[in-house]
């Protein structure tokens, strides 16, 4: 009986392996499955780029790397990724945390808030008025672009994103904003925001 049991179990194992091989082959031949997996990988190291088209901003070569700064009054650094500053272009990505961050976009969103803050500081130092039209363009992961768009439309400056169509997502976003406002929760805070300067360790301790 014991030998028979072993043979049966071995047969199950062989069948299971064969099924998995067939599934794997089907996935490799399925364009949609491949696209889905590539998108999932991209989500883990999502990047974002902000280009200033107009007004003209001088290019910085080589790019300056802006590291997370120490937050005043604490031992924590800003909860952001490194930002590569090329003058007219700001770039960042989750690549340094791709294995630990997983699909979380929290740190990237805070980094985007800082990039928008840098953009505004650059406009102020360049003497650009709030009424003057500023044209920018996005590149990178779709979710990161949506976050940047949300921050940009809440700026007091006349900033226009030339290559981003909010589409159905934009309509739903505005509907949700209005619904929350009608319930008394107010509207999103004006940009630029400094929420990325919130000490991470103290927030974690408070939750515990």
From Swiss-Prot:
Keywords: Cytoplasm, Protein transport, Transport, Virulence. Residues 184-208 are annotated as: Disordered. GO terms for cellular component: cytoplasm. Its main location: cytoplasm. GO terms for biological process: protein transport. The keyword Transport applies. Disruption phenotype: Shows attenuated virulence in guinea pigs. Mutant invades alveolar macrophages normally, but shows slower growth than wild-type strain. The mutant is twofold more susceptible to killing by human beta-defensin 2 but not to killing by other cationic peptides, serum complement, or polymorphonuclear neutrophils. It is found in: Cytoplasm. Disulfide bonds: none annotated. This is Type 4 adapter protein LvgA.
């Amino acid at each position: 009986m014991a030998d028979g049991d072993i043979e049966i179990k071995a047969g199950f194992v062989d069948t299971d392996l064969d099924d998995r091989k067939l599934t794997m082959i089907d996935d490799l031949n399925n364009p949609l499955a491949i696209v889905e997996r590539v998108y999932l990988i991209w989500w883990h190291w999502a990047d974002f780029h902000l280009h200033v088209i107009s007004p003209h901003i001088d290019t910085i070569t080589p790019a300056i790397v802006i590291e997370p700064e120490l937050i005043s009054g604490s031992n924590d650094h800003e909860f952001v990724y490194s930002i590569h500053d090329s003058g007219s272009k700001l770039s960042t990505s989750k690549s340094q945390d791709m294995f630990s961050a997983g699909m979380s976009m929290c740190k990237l969103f805070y980094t985007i808030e800082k990039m928008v803050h840098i953009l505004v500081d650059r406009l102020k130092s360049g003497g650009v008025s709030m009424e003057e039209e500023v044209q920018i363009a996005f590149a990178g992961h779709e979710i990161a672009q949506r976050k940047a768009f949300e921050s940009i439309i809440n700026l007091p400056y006349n900033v226009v994103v030339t290559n981003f169509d909010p589409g159905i997502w934009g309509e739903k976003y505005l509907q949700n904003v209005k619904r929350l406002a009608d319930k008394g929760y107010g509207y999103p805070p004006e940009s630029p925001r400094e929420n990325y300067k919130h000490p991470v360790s103290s927030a974690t301790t408070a939750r515990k």
